[in-house]
């Protein structure tokens, strides 16, 4: 199975959408003419073009190019150096109410706006958000790739679990079925006095 699906990674499956100049201008927060003027002045690279019939046309801009425009025009949203990154939680005491869908779309929208985003799937063993971003649970993702080692005190921080996605600016901490073990293993570690905090504070 792995031989068959080994190339089924976020990078291998990446399809780069392009935005027309008007759409790019809206995302950047400037006018279309400002983009054209910056390209003519050399502040921005010459746009990618293609020939259709006898007419040469812009093919549109990738999100990486749009983020570069934001940097050039100074419109990219930035967090103050001494500010703590905002944390947004999506939760409900019921299954099937679109928690994952809301989380994924919110993360992608924030990344589209030029922000750096870390989507933490956390304790969900289904791994749906991981799969949405090209990481197939229990094929690409195993217990050691999730938060489980961090929860069990085997890692000092969770940075080892961060993986890139096909969305520029959006990374993910994935999950897989192994997280079914988390509650029983946490309680076992707690009984042994090997947890840095109470289990309910770590979930």
How should each PLM-predicted stretch be described?
Residues 34:
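Residues in the helix-turn-helix
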Residues 1-23, 27, 37-203:
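P-loop NTP-binding core
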């Amino acid at each position: 199975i792995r031989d068959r699906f080994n190339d089924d990674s976020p990078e291998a499956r990446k399809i780069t959408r392009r935005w027309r100049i008007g759409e790019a201008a809206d995302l950047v927060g400037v006018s279309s003419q400002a983009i054209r003027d910056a390209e003519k002045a050399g502040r921005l690279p010459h746009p990618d073009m293609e020939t259709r019939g006898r007419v040469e046309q812009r093919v549109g801009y990738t999100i990486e190019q749009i983020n570069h425009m934001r940097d050039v025009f100074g419109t990219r949203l930035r967090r103050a150096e001494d500010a703590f990154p905002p944390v947004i939680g999506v939760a409900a005491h019921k299954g099937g109410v679109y928690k994952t869908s809301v989380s994924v779309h919110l993360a992608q929208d924030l990344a589209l706006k030029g922000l750096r985003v870390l989507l933490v799937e956390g304790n969900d063993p289904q791994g749906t958000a991981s799969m949405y971003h090209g990481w197939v649970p229990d094929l690409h993702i195993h217990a050691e790739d999730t938060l489980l080692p961090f929860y069990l005190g085997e890692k000092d921080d969770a940075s080892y679990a961060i993986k890139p996605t096909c969305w520029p600016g959006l990374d993910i901490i994935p999950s897989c079925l192994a997280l079914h073990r988390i509650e029983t293993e946490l309680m076992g570690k707690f009984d042994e006095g090997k947890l840095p905090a109470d289990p309910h504070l770590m979930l």
